[in-house]
């Protein structure tokens, strides 16, 4: 406040919890690279479990890591929820019904394309020879791009202690002009 005194405000927000939903059918659409069993294991959800949005988000993050390790750096996934206790009326609005509190989930995935490393370039290295830094790098030119290996490489280079700490956003991964499935790393 202008006079320097502290004042407190008490807020009361009424919350009315809705129904607690259980997971019904849990299907995957657009998944072709790993098996459905491997993809399903990333979520840790079984039919009949209580639906948990944070577990779904965590599962999507684990899927992004799984796909990123296989060169699919543009992978996207999003859940499509269909509660069984609602229907859509003629105006397109969801209307509650007396159905069970069960939600069916279709995980829609867009895998994108698999990328390969074209060229790895180190810039700003005036401390040591290029091969010293290159041997700490876990990606190889002409190999499949692996986002997990890139993160490990940054950590290993930082552990050398020769340079100021490198952050993940200091590394650029650019698509090679004219070759849609190749990337350069600098």
Where are these regions (language model features)?
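Periplasmic polypeptide-binding modules associated with outer-membrane biogenesis and secretion
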Residues: 1-186
């Amino acid at each position: 406040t202008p006079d320097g005194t502290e004042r407190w405000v008490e807020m009361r927000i009424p919350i009315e919890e809705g129904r607690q939903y259980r997971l019904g059918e849990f299907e995957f659409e657009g998944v072709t690279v790993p098996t459905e069993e491997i993809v399903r294991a990333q979520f840790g959800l079984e039919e009949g479990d209580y639906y948990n949005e944070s577990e779904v988000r965590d599962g999507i993050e684990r899927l992004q890591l799984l796909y990123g390790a296989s060169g699919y750096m543009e992978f996207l996934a999003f859940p499509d929820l269909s509660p069984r206790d609602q229907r859509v009326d003629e105006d397109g609005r969801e209307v509650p019904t007396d159905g069970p509190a069960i939600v069916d989930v279709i995980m829609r995935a867009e895998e994108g394309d698999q990328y390969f490393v074209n060229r790895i370039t180190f810039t700003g290295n005036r401390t040591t020879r290029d091969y010293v830094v290159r041997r700490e790098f876990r990606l190889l030119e002409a190999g499949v791009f692996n986002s997990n290996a890139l993160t490990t490489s940054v950590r290993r280079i930082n552990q050398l202690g020769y340079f100021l700490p490198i952050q993940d956003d200091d590394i650029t991964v650019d698509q090679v002009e004219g070759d849609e499935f190749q990337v350069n790393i600098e």
